């Protein structure tokens, strides 16, 4: 893959990924190293996300109607995402309109115009978005998981903010936040798809190299790592957290374990473990929970990864009367992995899991939007990131059963386990579940 990276004199990184195909599609976007974690203790919670909304409202050159009309006239797709650590703005469209799309993308990022009337209207929009998220059980459970594992740190607060904090964000807050964090040495511009680098480079360079880095001291959350790890180490017995979701026809169960700060070193092993448990219908959880017992339609396991800490999650949905039985079966499969040693993992499971991970990586390179997401997130989270697919695949191929077994023993400890349940539950089901489960 033709992957090119350049750094302007002001520190802004440019990433270009021309894709050799006949499909006239191009995607482009900005990644900024700021999210809700940067707000903690210094800025109003939710301002990163609020600013993301406002960037699409209008520029000093165009009203929102003009912006959206021009984008829609090309048939472009456009959106933005705020996470705990990053904010991304992107659009994709027919590469025949690349000049127009690039002009709009640069205008949105470089010339935002925060008008008071727009701010008040968008405040209401965000309040409605809050209601939508509150009605989604998985979102509510994820917030609760963060509150439990990341107490008194930046990861304990919501990306969208609270009702009170959103009510109090004003124009001055937005302008200060933009000038503080939207600076070149904290930003990456990325373009992927059917385009020629030489035809767009001069325009991009001339617009972005004008940006200067301010002298503001931005907030950092890197010091939180030891605090989070210490909180995780304090837990000495499993706990259950119940949430009554009376409108749900199923109960969502999330069985979680702390990964501490191990993902950065053992990420591949943890990803293989995840695939052994839930990768495809031949996985251990799919076999027992769906194919053999019919207890669930879907099951999944995955790591929630942040800078300095991570959590391993097993997520399953059960009928209310099957919660206890379902959790028991999940624990039984974890027991087998822990107690049967490296040889308890079959060659077939290792090969399948590694191939699934490789396939997932390769699928990132089919669609230009996925390409900018892959390279954007990797570059913004690791300023020294180097793309080497062969090296990545070679490392996967050299993983052993012993490697996966050792990380399994390390992170899947029942005394550190927290189970979150959202559904139609009675008050004593939590104690009943813990009484019924056997833990070593």
From Swiss-Prot:
Gene3D superfamilies noted in UniProt: Metalloenzyme, LuxS/M16 peptidase-like
Family statement drawn from the similarity comment of this UniProt entry: Belongs to the peptidase M16 family.
Classification via InterPro entries: Metalloenz_LuxS/M16, MPP/UQCRC_Complex, Pept_M16_N, Peptidase_M16_C
Keyword Zinc belongs to the record: yes
EC number: 3.4.24.-
Location of the active site: 52 (proton acceptor)
Enzyme superclass (EC): hydrolase
Keywords: Hydrolase, Metal-binding, Metalloprotease, Protease, Zinc
Protein's recorded name: Putative zinc protease L233
Superkingdom of the organism of origin: Viruses
GO biological process assignments: proteolysis
Residues involved in Zn(2+) binding: 49, 53, 129
Molecular function terms from GO: metal ion binding; metallopeptidase activity
